[in-house]
A protein has these predicted regions:
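Phosphodiester-processing cores and adjacent nucleic acid-binding clamps
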Residues: 1-171
């Protein structure tokens, strides 16, 4: 992420500069490959600096196949960030798939303790996959009962909109 803002915004008009800087933060855990992740978005300038810090530490201290962070580091640099629970490769979804609902809610409680209801969103996807549909239903039921203050977002796991955005995405 080094200098991403400067390089990405170079030559853009003021209107074209609108947007949020975000990253899929992979979690350092025992499961070394295809580690679960959270989506982190910089809401403020301080959040942007924290996003840079997290990416720096992920690349220099947590790298194992991919840059990774742990929840302790995330808690230290969470101010100004918004998080979402992401897709079916998230910790919560994996716990659900393994029928470990206690671990699923435990993980959510951990990240809820870091971000709170104003900066953590439960992410659901409209994909017509049995696994996704079941996971969405569990999220709806669980969060209606236990986590009323948290909001849901509907996402599509789209990393870029147009083919020509690929260069910026892979930047």
């Amino acid at each position: 992420m080094y200098c991403v803002e400067d390089r990405f915004r170079q030559g853009l008009t003021e209107e074209e500069r609108e947007g949020l800087t975000a990253t899929e933060a992979r979690e350092a855990n025992k499961q070394r490959l295809r580690s679960p992740h959270l989506l982190l978005l910089a809401e403020t300038d301080e959040g942007l600096q924290n996003l840079y810090r997290l990416n720096y530490y992920a690349a220099t201290q947590g790298f194992y196949g991919k840059p990774r962070i742990d929840l302790k580091l995330l808690a230290k640099y969470s101010k100004g960030l918004i998080a979402t629970t992401t897709c079916v490769i998230s910790n919560m979804a994996r716990y659900f798939q393994n029928k470990e609902i206690d671990k699923m809610t435990g993980f959510f409680n951990d990240i809820a303790g870091i971000f709170g209801p104003d900066n953590l969103f439960i992410e659901m996807h409209p994909h017509d996959l049995d696994m996704q549909l079941e996971y969405n239903q569990v999220l709806i039921e669980m969060f209606r009962k236990e986590y009323e203050g948290f909001k849901c977002i509907l996402a599509n796991d789209v990393h870029y909109v147009r083919k020509e955005h690929n260069d910026t995405h892979n930047f």
